[in-house]
Amino acid sequence: MATTLATDVRLSIAHQTRFALRLASTISSNPKSAASNAVFSPVSLHVALSLLAAGAGSATRDQLVATLGTGEVEGLHALAEQVVQFVLADASSAGGPHVAFANGVFVDASLPLKPSFQELAVCKYKADTQSVDFQTKAAEVATQVNSWVEKVTSGRIKDILPSGSVDNTTKLVLANALYFKGAWTDQFDSSGTKNDYFYLPDGSSVQTPFMSSMDDQYLSSSDGLKVLKLPYKQGGDKRQFSMYILLPEAPGGLSNLAEKLSAEPDFLERHIPRQRVALRQFKLPKFKISFETEASDLLKCLGLQLPFSNEADFSEMVDSPMAHGLRVSSVFHQAFVEVNEQGTEAAASTAIKMALLQARPPSVMDFIADHPFLFLLREDISGVVLFMGHVVNPLLSS
C-alpha cells in the first residue's frame, strides 16, 4: 500500500508540474502579462483548488480534478498532504531554507462546515478553520485574513483580499500563504556585480546590475535553450531546493518556450542540468518582482468553469441547504520573488472567495541572461514547483 501511495503521489506531482506549466503558458500568452515581469506560485494555487475540490460534489469536483490533472480526488489529497507536511516544512533550524506555509478556511457562522470536510482540511491540509461574521463584520474579517497572510509571508504579501472584495454577501474564504527564503550553495560575490545591457522584447535595452561568478555551474544546452540550475544551501535538510533559469537562445523566444513547456510534459525534465561545467562568461541579472492577479479568467482558460457558475456544487463543504447556492466569485493570487547575490526570497498567497542521460555539454560555455527568460523554483527530490515566472525587464518590480 505504501509503495502504491508513493507511486500515486509521484504521478500527482507530475500532474502538478503540468498544471504549473499550463499556467505559465497562459500567463505568457496574455499580452498584458507578457509585457511585464510575472511570478506566481503553482503549489499555492494547486493546494487551494485541491481543498476546494474536497468540498465539491459531482460534476464540479470532477472538473476541478480534471483541471488539476489527477485521475481522482484522493490523489489531490495525498499530494497535498505530502506537500504541506514534507515539501513546505521549515528547514531553517537545520541550516536549510526558511519555508512557511499555512492554509485557512474562514466560513460565515450561518454555514457550518461538514464534519468530513473539516476533518480532511485539518488532517490532510493542516488548515485552520474559523467561524466568522461576514454579515455584520466583513471588513474586520478581511483585515483578519490579510494580517494572517502578512504574518506567514513575513510582510511580503499585505492585502491578499483587496479593499471592498469581502462584503455581507460573502460566505466563505479559502486562503493559503507561502514564504521561502534560501541562500545559494555558492553565493555570488557582490563586488563582481556590475551594470550591463539587458535587451527588451521591443529591441531596446536597459542597464541593470548583473551578478557574475567564476565557479563551475550546473548548465545544459540543447534545442535552442540553456538551463541553469542554482542549488540552495540545505544544511542538514534532506530536501533539495533549486532555482532554474530557462534562457531561450533567441531573444524573442519566451512565448515559444512557454508553449513548448506546456505542450511537452517531459520537456522540462529532459533539460534539467545534471553536471557542472566551466563557464567562460556567466552573467545573471538581479531581479525583484511583485505580481498580483484575480485568477478566475486564468483558470477558466484552463477549462475550470463550473465552480464559478450557478451550477456549482459545494454540497460536501457546508452542512446547510444554502450549499447549493455557493459558487466561487473570486480567486485572488499574489506572489513576490527577489533574487540577489545571497539567494532568493519569495512569497505567495491564494485566496478563493468562495535519472536521465544527457549529452555532455561543450567543455567551455557562456551563460549570459541578457534577454527575457523564464525561471522556476522547485524542490528537486519531489519535483514540486513552488514558484514560476518570467523576467522581461529586471528593472521593473511589478
Curated annotation (Swiss-Prot):
Keywords: Protease inhibitor, Serine protease inhibitor. It holds the Pfam family Serpin. GO terms for cellular component: extracellular space. The record marks L357, Q358 as: Reactive bond. It comes from the Eukaryota. One of its GO terms (molecular function) is serine-type endopeptidase inhibitor activity. Residues 343-367 are annotated as: RCL. Belongs to the serpin family. The reactive center loop (RCL) extends out from the body of the protein and directs binding to the target protease. The protease cleaves the serpin at the reactive site within the RCL, establishing a covalent linkage between the carboxyl group of the serpin reactive site and the serine hydroxyl of the protease. The resulting inactive serpin-protease complex is highly stable. Inhibits chymotrypsin and cathepsin G in vitro. This is Serpin-Z1C. It comes from Triticum aestivum.
